[in-house]
Amino acid sequence: PDLNQIVALSASDDAVIPTTVAPSGPDETLPPPPVRVMVVGDSFALSVGLGLEHWANESGQIGVLNTGIVGCGFGRGGMNRGINLEREWPDACKERDQILAQKMGVFQPDIVLLTGGMWDITDRKLDGTDTWTHVGEPVYDAYLEAEFRYLTDFLGSTGATVVWTTAPTFSPEYNPQTFMGKPPYYEARPGRSERYNEILRRALEARPNSRVVAL
């Protein structure tokens, strides 16, 4: 299959921002504006963002900008073999930070929500190396911790609170109709999500503008 098609799907450019209803009487106060939430991550984040968009429309309490991109992990560069397909870091992912900076400038989020992790717990070749590595190995752990800190600082640069969710346990099911290699899948190996979550919490210890929410 054309591996570039794995990242062909991304979120809409349109934010879901409920309108504020004016007070109906002289004694009523104007309700606070919706909290602006920008969702960042891969297909997992894309799905979470779609759910938040529905809730935004129903509740009027939040505005949502869904920037999830299928196939884009949080860590930059190198190669990975998620869903058992070896591939370079996709072109769409290489443009991610530039796109996010532009979207932050327009949307002005109060909260940036990052969720996902599958592409970061699978096996990876880091830039400039020829060896597969993964969470639990010191070199990769140091790389991932630095990437968490980088994204937290970058996405919090406009004053937003940066909220990360922990990674769930991933157990991909093979579907020959989709762009997947056959199992077994490296990201499904025991302990990987748990190690990811340990690194995430450690990375954010000195970042007062950040939070970790357990899924």
Predicted ranges, named:
Residues P172-L215:
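Substrate-gating cap/lid alpha-helix
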Residues P31-V40, F44-P138:
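Conserved SGNH/GDSL esterase-like catalytic core that processes O-acyl groups on lipids
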Residues N57, G156, E205:
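Anion (oxyanion) recognition and catalysis
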Residues S157-T161:
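A short helix->loop->beta-strand "cap" motif at the edges of active sites that frequently abuts
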Residues G116-M118, T166-T169, L215:
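Short, well-ordered beta-to-alpha junction loops that form the rim of enzyme active sites
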Residues D13-T29:
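Extracellular mucin-like PTS domains
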Residues T133-A142, P184-A188:
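The substrate-binding groove and active-site-proximal loops of carbohydrate-active enzymes
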Residues F44, V48, L52, R96, ...:
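Stable alpha-helical elements in mature extracytoplasmic
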